């Protein structure tokens, strides 16, 4: 809203970079190889700075530091659970103190509009960390009335060294989603940040130290997937790996985990989420929300509503209004408060998306607006809408991860369920209708980890998120998000005489 935007402090459009090395044991290190790589401002294509390029040797150092911090009797293992919660709250307070700086740095490195970085990403980071801070001393085992003269109870113990590999589309937020539950439950972390967007997560490393987390509890290695990421996934002394990214890389992570030490795996992968517009939907709201569902974050959302199914009797009106809305979308400098859409994250994504647009045209979808680059420098793409999309087209099956909307026509509710579920993905789905029966029927019939009814992209730290099918395994957020970070231990004790 305009009121919220006016409350956002003005950004420094050239935020200084303080942290561009590898963070191990609460200290900054160059890569063992001394190699660096550039991180680029996607608005201009210019290099922001060089960053230390971590590889297997650096991951090994980080894992050793984490393992040492997790030894029995260490300050971290001996710490009261309530104090782990206090540290997480302290970290959230420090992020809030530096919120304006972090939001500007996120925009510089990722390209998302600064107003969104400040109001959405940073807000959700704080809420996530504070939510998990509250869980630190409240997630615990049970006593169990076992048969015989025995006393039995369970402990929820930390898994140990957790490898966490985070993506470039929500760098700070995905860092919080990973750190919150891992640290609340007493684990130690080796995190690999995306090479496109390493800067904000590395700055948070400084705040982790300032908050008072013991050395080695959190270690952060910037680097590339095939080197640093692969080293984490196949490491024999990493107990668990959590990955957010593409389904293609998800396969590699699961294989690496299986062929090494069978480490626990949670995956949050791609999607091709159906957004179903019934003919009785509130049309103004449905058009705006379907636009938001696809175009938010430059279309770079794993759960984007990227197959918009519209019932035939409102199809023409919906298409016409969606095209008008896409044409009015403001693309430009992400530091300008009027901007709705910034650049794609890098040249690779930019070219890939333009390739998908070309394939849509070649396969016979109707290009209704957009379709090309939106500026002569940087990685900006025009908001693009395709109509008359058929299920078999590449743009209807594959994740584009860009500002390209596919609109498909359907007749009946039974038909749309079959078509919506006919995908290898199952991350999210949405339904717009005023009919309670249709909403309830569809929410149960759709194969997806999240179903939104008359809304889209509504997240709360309290509600779990994750995928069916090839969109991943495990859940993040909520109480469910703690399960992946704990082992349940049963302790059974012989007693002289059991009494009820």
Swiss-Prot record:
Binding site for NAD(+): 245-250
Subcellular location: Mitochondrion matrix
Modification after translation (UniProt): In response to mitochondrial stress, the precursor protein is ubiquitinated by the SIFI complex in the cytoplasm before mitochondrial import, leading to its degradation. Within the SIFI complex, UBR4 initiates ubiquitin chain that are further elongated or branched by KCMF1.
Listed InterPro entries: Ald_DH/histidinol_DH, Ald_DH_C, Ald_DH_CS_CYS, Ald_DH_CS_GLU, Ald_DH_N, Aldehyde_DH_dom
Active site: 268 (proton acceptor), 302 (nucleophile)
Molecular function terms, GO-annotated: aldehyde dehydrogenase (NAD+) activity; carboxylesterase activity; NAD binding; phenylacetaldehyde dehydrogenase (NAD+) activity
Marked site: Transition state stabilizer: 169
Record key words, sorted: Acetylation, Mitochondrion, NAD, Oxidoreductase, Ubl conjugation
EC number: 1.2.1.3
GO CC aspect terms: mitochondrial matrix; mitochondrion
One of the GO BP terms on file: regulation of serotonin biosynthetic process
Chain positions with N6-acetyllysine modification: 35, 56, 61, 142, 351, 358, 366, 390, 409, 411, 424, 434
Annotated metabolic or biological route of this protein: Alcohol metabolism; ethanol degradation; acetate from ethanol: step 2/2
Assembly, per entry: Homotetramer.
Xref: PANTHER family: ALDEHYDE DEHYDROGENASE-RELATED (PTHR11699)
Function summary: Required for clearance of cellular formaldehyde, a cytotoxic and carcinogenic metabolite that induces DNA damage.
Protein name: Aldehyde dehydrogenase, mitochondrial
Organism this protein belongs to: Mesocricetus auratus
Lineage of the species this protein comes from: Eukaryota, Metazoa, Chordata, Craniata, Vertebrata
Gene transcribed to yield this protein: ALDH2
């Amino acid at each position: 809203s305009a009121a919220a935007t006016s409350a956002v402090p003005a950004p420094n459009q050239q935020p200084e970079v303080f942290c561009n090395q590898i963070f191990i044991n609460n200290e900054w290190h160059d890569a063992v190889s001394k190699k660096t790589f550039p991180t680029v401002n996607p608005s201009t294509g210019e290099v922001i700075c060089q960053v230390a390029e971590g590889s297997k040797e650096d991951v090994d150092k980080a894992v050793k530091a984490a393992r040492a911090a997790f030894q029995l009797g260490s300050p971290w293992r001996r710490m009261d659970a309530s104090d782990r919660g206090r540290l997480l709250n302290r970290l959230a307070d420090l992020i809030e103190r530096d919120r304006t700086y972090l939001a500007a740095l996120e925009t510089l490195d990722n390209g998302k509009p600064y107003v969104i970085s400040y109001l959405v990403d940073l807000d959700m980071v704080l809420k996530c960390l504070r939510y998990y801070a509250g869980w630190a001393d409240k997630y615990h085992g049970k006593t169990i009335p076992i048969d015989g003269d025995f006393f039995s109870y369970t402990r929820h113990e930390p898994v140990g060294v957790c490898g966490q590999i985070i993506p470039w589309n929500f760098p700070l937020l995905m860092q919080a989603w990973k750190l919150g539950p891992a640290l609340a439950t007493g684990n130690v972390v080796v995190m690999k940040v995306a090479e496109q967007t390493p800067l904000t997560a590395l700055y948070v490393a400084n705040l982790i130290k300032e908050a008072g987390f013991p050395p080695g509890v959190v270690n952060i290695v910037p680097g590339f997937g095939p080197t640093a990421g692969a080293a984490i996934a196949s490491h024999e002394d990493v107990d668990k790996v959590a990955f957010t990214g593409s389904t293609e890389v998800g396969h590699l992570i699961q294989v690496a985990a299986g062929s090494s030490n069978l480490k626990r795996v949670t995956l949050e992968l791609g999607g091709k989420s159906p957004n179903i517009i019934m003919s009785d939907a509130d049309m103004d709201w449905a058009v705006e929300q379907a636009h938001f569902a696809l175009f938010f974050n430059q279309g770079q959302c794993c759960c984007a509503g990227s197959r918009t199914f519209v019932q035939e009797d409102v199809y023409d009106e919906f298409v016409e209004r969606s095209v008008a809305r896409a044409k009015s979308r403001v693309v430009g400098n992400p530091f300008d408060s009027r901007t709705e859409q910034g650049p794609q994250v890098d040249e690779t994504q930019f070219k890939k998306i333009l390739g998908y647009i070309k394939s849509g045209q070649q396969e016979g979808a109707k290009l209704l607006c957009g379709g090309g680059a939106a500026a002569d420098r940087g990685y900006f793409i025009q908001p693009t809408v395709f109509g008359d999309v058929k299920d078999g087209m590449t743009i209807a099956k594959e994740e584009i991860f860009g500002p390209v909307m596919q609109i498909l026509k359907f007749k009946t509710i039974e038909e749309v369920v079959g078509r919506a579920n006919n995908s290898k993905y199952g991350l999210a789905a949405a339904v717009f209708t005023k009919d309670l029966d249709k909403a309830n029927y569809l929410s149960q019939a759709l194969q997806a980890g999240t179903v939104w009814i008359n809304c889209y992209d509504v997240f709360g730290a309290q509600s779990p998120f994750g995928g069916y099918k090839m969109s991943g395994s495990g859940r993040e957020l909520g109480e469910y998000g703690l399960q992946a970070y704990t082992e349940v231990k049963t302790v059974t004790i012989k007693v002289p005489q059991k009494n009820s």
